[in-house]
A protein has these predicted regions:
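N-terminal intrinsically disordered/low-complexity leader segments
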Residues: 1-9
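Solvent-exposed, amphipathic alpha-helical segments
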Residues: 13, 17-24, 71-74, 103, ...
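Helix-turn-helix
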Residues: 13, 17-55, 59
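Hydrophobic alpha-helical connector segments
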Residues: 59, 70-101, 146-153
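Short, basic, alpha-helical segments at the C-terminal edge of helix-turn-helix-like DNA-binding modules
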Residues: 62-67
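Amphipathic alpha-helical segments used for helix-helix packing
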Residues: 95-122
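Hydrophobic/aromatic-rich alpha-helical bundle segments in the mid-to-C-terminal region
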Residues: 117-122, 138-188
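Short, solvent-exposed amphipathic helices
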Residues: 120-127, 131
Length: 189
């Protein structure tokens, strides 16, 4: 009797491999052929799970975003760090964070022309804003305009992450953390 195949698990594994290729070499590296080779599958196996490259790339994006969310959630439940410090886990302060940002930034040009991906990007941005808003309120329950300040903080986080992704030597984890903490203090005044 053939071994049972967990199709969701295999689909997730292919999405993870595509994300790994994107992190290492950019979107152009994540062809169906390259992903199949990296997975040790035929292209037929990959196309069984994904109708085309676009569907595979969308799954890779979702995998990366959900992994970053999972990392944040795990940190939030595992440690006593203050809420604003926990948000630092969303920055490229280590290899896992740098990988996530390299993937995320590869999709920006696509989201400009792909409505489904743009919707996905907007949802994750709104999710990030809500995580930040909740942290700001937790640190300072009497904060005024928590929504507006959360949007500003998300912009700060994005700016730090972009700089650190493109200039990791100039933006080590210590500088990212110091900049994030300083900007959050300004918002909480």
């Amino acid at each position: 009797m053939p071994a049972a195949v967990d199709h969701d698990e295999k689909r997730d594994a292919i999405a993870r491999i595509a994300a790994d290729l994107i992190a290492a070499r950019g979107l152009d590296a994540a062809t169906i052929r390259q992903v199949a080779a990296a997975a040790g599958y035929s292209t037929t196996v990959v196309t069984h799970y994904f109708a085309n490259k676009r569907a595979m790339l969308l799954a890779a994006y979702r995998h990366a975003a959900e992994s970053a969310q999972g990392r944040f959630d795990a940190l939030a439940t595992e440690c006593n760090a203050d809420p604003l410090s926990r948000l630092e886990s969303l920055l490229p302060i280590d290899e896992e964070g740098r990988r996530a940002w390299r993937i995320y930034l590869q999709y920006w040009p696509l989201a400009d022309h792909d409505e489904e991906l743009a919707i996905e990007q907007r949802w994750w941005s709104a999710n990030g804003t809500e995580l930040i808003r909740a942290a700001l309120v937790q640190v300072c329950p009497e904060i005024d305009d928590a929504d507006g300040k959360a949007a500003i903080a998300l912009s700060v986080l994005l700016g730090i992450a972009i700089q650190a992704t493109f200039d990791p030597a100039g933006w080590p984890a210590s500088r990212q953390s110091a900049m994030w903490q300083a900007q959050c203090k300004l918002l909480l005044r």
